[in-house]
From Swiss-Prot:
Catalytic activity entry: L-serine(in) + Na(+)(in) = L-serine(out) + Na(+)(out); L-threonine(in) + Na(+)(in) = L-threonine(out) + Na(+)(out)
Gene Ontology biological process terms from the UniProt entry: serine transport; threonine transport
Bilayer-crossing regions: 12-32, 42-62, 81-101, 141-161, 179-199, 218-238, 245-267, 288-308, 330-350
SUPFAM superfamilies hit by this protein: Proton glutamate symport protein
Identification of the protein by name: Serine/threonine transporter SstT
InterPro entries for the chain: Na-dicarboxylate_symporter, Na:dicarbo_symporter_sf, Ser_Thr_transp_SstT
Species in which this protein is naturally found: Campylobacter jejuni subsp. jejuni serotype O:6 (strain 81116 / NCTC 11828)
Length: 407
């Protein structure tokens, strides 16, 4: 009987389960403060599990990605689209930074008043702080959650192992798969953690806490829509000197719609390839560019990482300088490229960006947990933006005469 319940839960729809957890959490938070405190243990366990796996995830994900990917045989078109993917992701992260400056959001979190970390303000202090974090001992970086140090050693290790044997690379691929399975298991437990977090949040802060979540979600979705209809439109127009919106709406209708519900760029690859074929793009080109885009074209993830990191900074009262904002845009761009193929990958990379501002690791992970609460909508919109942009950029880089008469 118990095993059947576990199997039924494991096969269940995660979105539906999270929604149930949110509703039950609100009801418990309103009705009983005592039960909410007990339920909060589930939230603490969930965030603790995320804190434990996140450093290892970032390290092995980036190291494996660098040492196993081979672009040496790429032609001019592939090199162009790689550049376009990275530029598009950077512009998305820059838009997210600007959006947060104009419409800052503060979250209601327990423990924020105890946060004593301050962000360096002078350029010399910023670079000194960055350099010391970068050259941190790799073991210490992993144990303390120093994500800049983790990122540095992962990149260095990936480059150093670039020319190792295929058998050695396969070992890292297998380790990467093992870590991803652990992450998927933890994420599958998200409904229980979210239930506890929501119950405690409602009991402690009332409607004010939930309202801050809604404001954050609106900021995220609005920024992603701005990237879709303004930034991407400008990129297409600059590249083709043609009206970008017919192609954008085709990509939204035939790619974003499916990606919204699958919540996976990888799962949407066959859909995108079929759309590219209908558009009349060379198979040799989109056969490489679409899977590549599902790996490194992460505009939506960059928006999520940048906005939630700055929201964490706003919450603890840290003022961000222009230089730090620029550095955040760069970090969010490359962190987003490492978020592919991971359930909640963009959320788990938020501590990497938060480390730029000396934000306490516990607070960063609380923001990650809130990201899972709003992720029912945020992750769907993020994936829709990521996946539809794969086709959009593939189409304009292909130089083919496109077929716009698609039903």
């Amino acid at each position: 009987m118990f095993s059947k319940i576990i199997q039924s839960y494991a096969k269940g729809n995660l979105i539906v389960q999270i929604c149930i957890g949110i509703v039950l959490g609100i009801l418990i938070g309103i009705s009983s403060k005592e039960i909410s405190e007990i339920a909060n243990l589930l939230g603490i366990l969930f965030t603790s599990a995320l804190k434990a796996i996140a450093p290892m995830l970032v390290f092995i994900l980036i190291l494996t990605s660098i040492c196993t990917k081979d672009f040496s045989q790429s032609g001019a078109k592939i090199k162009n689209i790689i550049i376009l993917y990275i530029v598009g992701t950077f512009l998305a992260s820059a838009c997210a930074v600007l959006a947060n400056f104009f419409f800052p959001v503060k979250l209601v979190l327990d423990g924020v008043q105890t946060a004593t970390n301050s962000s360096p303000t002078h350029m010399s202090e910023i670079f000194k702080d960055l350099l010391f974090k970068i050259v941190d001992n790799p073991i210490n970086a992993l144990s303390s959650g120093n994500y800049l140090g983790i990122l540095t050693w992962a990149i260095a290790g990936g480059i150093a192992l670039k020319h190792c044997s295929n058998e050695a690379k396969q070992v890292f691929i297998d380790i990467n798969e093992g870590v991803l399975k652990i992450v998927k298991f933890i994420v599958k437990l998200a409904p229980f953690g979210i239930f506890g977090l929501v119950a405690n949040s409602v009991a402690q802060t009332g409607a004010q806490g939930l309202l801050s979540y809604v404001k954050l979600l609106i900021l995220l979705v609005t920024t992603m829509l701005f990237v879709t209809f303004v930034i991407n439109a400008l990129i297409v127009f600059f590249y083709t000197r043609k009206n970008p919106f017919p192609l954008i709406f085709i990509c939204l209708r035939h790619s974003a719609f499916f990606a919204f519900f699958t919540r996976s760029s990888a799962a949407n690859i066959p859909v995108n390839m079929a759309l590219c074929a209908k558009l009349g793009i060379d198979k040799e080109f989109y056969g490489i560019s679409i899977p590549l885009g599902a790996t490194i074209n992460m505009a939506g993830a960059a928006v999520t990482i940048a906005i939630l990191s700055l929201t964490a900074a706003n919450t603890v009262g840290i003022e961000i300088s222009l230089l730090q904002a620029f550095l955040l845009s760069i970090i969010a761009t490359f962190a987003a490229c490492g978020a592919s193929g991971v359930a909640g990958g963009s959320l788990l990379l938020i501590p990497l960006a938060c480390s730029l501002f000396n934000i306490d690791y516990d607070i960063a992970m609380k923001v990650v947990a809130i990201g899972f609460i709003i992720g029912v909508i945020q992750d769907s919109v993020e994936t829709a933006l990521n996946s539809s942009t794969d086709v959009l950029f593939t189409a304009i880089c292909s130089k083919n005469e496109l077929n716009y008469n698609i039903k």
